[in-house]
Amino acid sequence: SSDVCSSDLYTVYFYAETDTPAESFGTWKGNTLMPNTNEQFDSGEKTGAYLSYSTSENQKINVRVGISYISCGKAKENLKQITTWDFNKVHTQAVSEWNNILDKIEVAGNEEDKIKLYTALYHCYLQPVDKTGENPKWISTEPNFDDFYAIWDTFRATHPLFTLLTPSVQSNMIRSLIDIYRNEGY
């Protein structure tokens, strides 16, 4: 993969578990299926994995996925953050975490205006992503945020908003920018 602001390629590793054994599995690269293989390496071609099931009507299969920019082993370790197979519990926890941020602002007005505001707040927090512990470029104990999209514009309103709503997150972003400067010179 590559990111929006850079042509530098990077690898995303993943580790997945299901609550139901697959009847068959494999990987694919380009147009070639590779049955019974459980890992694949980046070669610039489109690459993926598949699982096949025979399911009964309305049967649900739960999947947990961990990702990492470091290794498959780190992806497996990151998967441990999801402690349950209960989708509703995971969903409720995610909603609660978002509400901890979104509830910091109270809005008077009609529903349409509230939807616009809360959608914009949600979008503000989609990037940059906290990838602390996932820096493949250098070893650091500092926070790691490396996907500052259009920072030349977001410093005007988004980052002051972060300072008001989530000052510790904003502080970590600044520490990350300083760490990038120390290691890459910009």
Where do the PLM segments sit?
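Terminal amphipathic helices with adjacent charged low-complexity linkers/tails
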Residues: 67-79
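Short strand-edge motifs at loop-to-beta-strand transitions and within beta-strands
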Residues: 47-51
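Edge strands and adjacent loops of beta-rich recognition modules
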Residues: 25-45, 92-99
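Short, small-residue-biased leader/transition segments that mark boundaries at the very start
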Residues: 3-6
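Short Pro-Gly-centered flexible turn/kink motifs
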Residues: 55-67
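Accessory "access/gating" subregions that flank catalytic or transport cores
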Residues: 86-143
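Alpha-helical support elements that line or immediately flank enzyme active sites
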Residues: 119-132, 147-171
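Helix-terminus loop motifs that line ligand-binding clefts
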Residues: 138, 169-186
